[in-house]
From Swiss-Prot:
The keyword DNA-binding applies. Homodimer, forms a heterotetramer with a Cas2 homodimer. GO terms for molecular function: DNA binding; endonuclease activity; metal ion binding. Keywords: Antiviral defense, DNA-binding, Endonuclease, Hydrolase, Magnesium, Manganese, Metal-binding, Nuclease. GO terms for biological process: defense response to virus; maintenance of CRISPR repeat elements. It comes from Thermofilum pendens (strain DSM 2475 / Hrk 5). Signal peptide: none annotated. Belongs to the CRISPR-associated endonuclease Cas1 family. InterPro entries: Cas1, CRISPR-assoc_Cas1, CRISPR-assoc_Cas1_C. CRISPR (clustered regularly interspaced short palindromic repeat), is an adaptive immune system that provides protection against mobile genetic elements (viruses, transposable elements and conjugative plasmids). CRISPR clusters contain spacers, sequences complementary to antecedent mobile elements, and target invading nucleic acids. CRISPR clusters are transcribed and processed into CRISPR RNA (crRNA). Acts as a dsDNA endonuclease. Involved in the integration of spacer DNA into the CRISPR cassette. This is CRISPR-associated endonuclease Cas1. Mn(2+) binds at E149, H221, E235.
Amino acid sequence: MRLLVLRGVDEVTVSSRSTVVIKSGNRVFERALRDVDAVLVVGSGIKISSSLPPVLALHGIPLSILAKGHVAVLLNPVGTKYNNYRALQYTLPKNKALAIALEYLKSRVRGMASIIRNRGGRLPALPEPPDPALYEDPARLESDIRSWEAAASNTLWDEVFKLLDPSAARELRERYGFAGRKPGHPDPLNKAISAMYAVLYTLSTKALVAAGLDPTYGFLHRTQYSVPLAFDYAEAFKPLAVEAALDLVNEEGLPTLSEDGDLDKDSLNKAMKRLYRYLSAKHRETGKTPYQQIHLKAFCLAKHLEGKCSREKLAFTWDKKRYIIHE
């Protein structure tokens, strides 16, 4: 995973069409773009040269910015109309598109359940997901998917938070007014999860583009997100970030926030290392890593639109016990 994460630097620019220049105080660093798959900027105080986005776009490298609780992913949209997979994506019947999005949500639910089960928590009873085959009206199907997802997620998050170290959980409630998973809430746990989610959105965008798909055209997420298909797709991989966040808090304590409200540089580095540990884990049977699956499942989605990959094979399900974790 060649992700360039920038936090606590002053300015990011380019010196040519192949090199990123990072300025921090009196120090200047250079990074060759051939060694970068994606760029994530964290914080609102970093000056970004106007020359950076077009140069990254030239290399097909997405630029993500996470600041003040929001993430935006920028990429080059040129040529999206001239690809067979994208043509199929744009003309996909709404019910079929929703059925695909549902598979990713079901995968996230299974992954969250595995975290609870593997850590000795109480696995709660969950509502049954809707069956797309029983629906003719896409509006009703979408409404039922959203209702099911909200109910299942709230139930699972309640149990996940019970897995936190008691002292950390108490500090979250008393100091930060913590009340569960809320992306914009100014507490260090939500900030850590959001930062890791931003990585998944960035990697998903890169994978979808490589597979010939348009990440700006989503199935369930709407256009208020910069890359709604990447948000749909990344649902399946979110349990990796949840697992990593639990490890971070339970083993190292709550992350530290900087003055701008985001994770400070040291805490961000720790969060990224925890996430990378799981992204690079090898499956005990297939030998594939979750990072590889982000790309492989994107190609499966493209093939599915042609009828060459079944819907059941679209999603990735995280289960820590099935992986070899490198310390």
